[in-house]
């Protein structure tokens, strides 16, 4: 990789600190989201609170791809169990995003100069997807941090040819891949961006990373039903495409500069932005796998490119500089309401806390409860007290006892018998717009409710319907 543009180079600390502090402030702003929790975070919470033997047994059947993250959360809750559970759940992501923003600034500093790096870190911290996952109790922000850190080490390894730095790169990438195996796509992007002189070493290191990932990949391939919910490209792709187009436009602008001036960034950043997402999209005709959070680290590539263009514009004089300042101000005005919206319960697919409150208000001791579909039992994992006194009419074994995410259910005939022996049932369902599951258990739930019960009332909360059904005349 060629040298970055030559110029005054402030201390690295001065470059990294402002983006890191900005990211930390944004991450702490509204981090509790009004006490709301959505279903993926509920899974994280439940898995983190299982015993280590139960957790290990569950990972053998489901969610092995997130196993290391659940183990991390298990340790944190063991140490800080008396603290606010939402903070314990989300602070790792807040801190990881702050570290990623600061590290990205250092990476940009090496690739394009100090101011370009600082601006890249600030842009990264402000991107809506980055703000979103900075406040989620899932692994994606931590994976993003590790990929950004590995990218920094990769640039240093190429510059110094140090085996120790190459080993550090390999170790960090292995950690990222063990937290989420799609981080391995960043290795492909890194290989693509390497200069020819470093590719042989890069290939050897990539082989080590893939070898360490292989056991997890084999296990998770046997759990492919975990991603069966991905129905194809949709809204996720629209948002990611907008960021990608912005980044690629910036890359084109940067390539207009002579090589000695533009530095290595226009060759490095587009690969990180485009390749991982493109490789996921290639699988769509056979098995849809693209979800924007799986390649959240690609936004680091976009931020590097935008930061470099902003730096280039600020070096210019007259109209170009004025346009850059106005465009930046307009972008900040647009991002403010987006940021506010991300910190509301309505920003997520559902609200487990609101569901629990609605169930507690609707149910009475002795009532039955049905989850339609069965995986919506996740809504009761965090607050089992909301269904205490209610009889789960379909349940065979609970999530922890069955070493599954949502528990196992009795056969359809057993569900029918239990429903017919119950006078009043609280039903937890998806919104009307969601497709219906076609399993025998789900079909019999719908048929018995339609034939033998009447709907007494329905309360709608974010991402869910809580209905009360009773025998005719018993509402």
For each feature predicted by the language model, list its residue ranges.
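Terminal, non-globular segments
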Residues: 2-475
């Amino acid at each position: 990789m060629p040298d970055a543009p030559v110029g005054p180079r402030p201390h690295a600390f001065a470059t990294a600190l402002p983006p890191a502090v900005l990211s930390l402030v944004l991450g702490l702003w509204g981090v509790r989201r009004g006490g709301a929790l959505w279903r993926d975070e509920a899974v994280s919470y439940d898995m983190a609170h299982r015993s280590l033997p139960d957790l290990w047994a569950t990972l053998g059947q489901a969610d092995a791809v997130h196993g290391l993250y659940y183990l991390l959360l298990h340790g944190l809750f063991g140490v800080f169990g008396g603290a606010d559970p939402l903070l314990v759940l989300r602070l790792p992501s807040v801190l990881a995003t702050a570290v990623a923003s600061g590290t990205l600034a250092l990476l940009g500093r090496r690739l394009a100069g100090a101011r370009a790096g600082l601006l890249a870190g600030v842009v990264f911290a402000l991107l809506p997807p980055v703000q979103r996952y900075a406040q989620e109790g899932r692994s994606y922000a931590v994976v993003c941090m590790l990929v950004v850190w590995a990218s920094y080490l990769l640039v240093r390894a190429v510059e110094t040819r140090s085996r120790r730095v190459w080993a550090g790169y390999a170790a960090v990438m292995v950690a990222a891949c063990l937290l989420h195996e799609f981080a391995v796509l960043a290795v492909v992007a890194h290989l693509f961006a390497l200069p020819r002189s470093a590719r042989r070493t890069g290939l050897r290191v990539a082989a080590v990373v893939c070898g360490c990932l292989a056991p997890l990949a084999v296990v998770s391939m046997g759990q492919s039903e975990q991603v069966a919910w991905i129905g194809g490209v949709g809204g996720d792709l629209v948002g990611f495409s907008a960021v990608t187009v912005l980044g690629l436009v910036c890359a084109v602008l940067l390539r207009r500069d002579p090589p000695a001036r533009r530095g290595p960034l226009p060759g490095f950043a587009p690969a990180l932005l485009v390749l991982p997402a493109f490789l996921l999209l290639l699988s769509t005709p056979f098995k849809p796998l693209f979800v924007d959070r799986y390649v959240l680290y690609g936004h680091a590539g976009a931020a590097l490119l935008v930061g470099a263009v902003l730096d280039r514009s600020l070096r210019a004089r007259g109209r170009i500089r004025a346009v850059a300042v106005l465009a930046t101000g307009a972008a900040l005005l647009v991002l403010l309401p987006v940021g506010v919206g991300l910190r509301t319960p309505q920003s997520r697919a559902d609200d487990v806390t609101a569901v629990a409150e609605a169930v507690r208000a609707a149910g009475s001791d002795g009532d039955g409860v049905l989850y339609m579909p069965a995986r919506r039992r996740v809504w009761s994992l965090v607050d089992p007290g909301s269904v205490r006194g209610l009889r789960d009419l379909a349940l065979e074994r609970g999530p922890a006892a069955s070493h599954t995410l949502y528990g196992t259910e009795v056969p359809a005939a057993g569900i029918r018998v239990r429903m017919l022996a119950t006078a009043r049932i609280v039903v937890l369902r998806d919104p009307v717009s969601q497709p219906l599951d076609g399993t025998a258990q789900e079909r019999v739930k719908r048929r018995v409710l339609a034939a033998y019960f009447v709907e007494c009332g329905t309360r709608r909360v974010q991402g869910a319907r809580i209905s009360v059904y009773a025998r005719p005349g018993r509402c």
